[in-house]
């Protein structure tokens, strides 16, 4: 048997509600209303925190995938630009070769390569 003492005075105090005072608009006969928030209290804070973490993880993954896709696109574009530049240079040398002697053309190529290295 337990030896708990129950005070009879505590129960009636909690049952008595505190008066709210006079209403601002003067309609004391109306029952006080609370804000209508049907969604509040349906999900716990832990649940909301979990969903936020999950959404953040998904967003990070999506961002990573987008960055990878963009990097791949830039790499392909750069390869295409380099390929076009090489093709244009080759055509230019072919036109020069039609006009110049072979040895002179080789010297010109070497000279241009030295200038490229110096300028870059």
UniProtKB/Swiss-Prot annotation:
Residues 24-36 have a biased composition (Basic residues). Residues 54-114 form a coiled coil. GO terms for cellular component: nucleolus. It is found in: Nucleus, Nucleolus. Belongs to the CGR1 family. This is rRNA-processing protein CGR1. It comes from the Eukaryota. Keywords: Coiled coil, Nucleus, Ribosome biogenesis, rRNA processing. Residues 1-47 are annotated as: Disordered. Involved in nucleolar integrity and required for processing of the pre-rRNA for the 60S ribosome subunit. GO terms for biological process: rRNA processing.
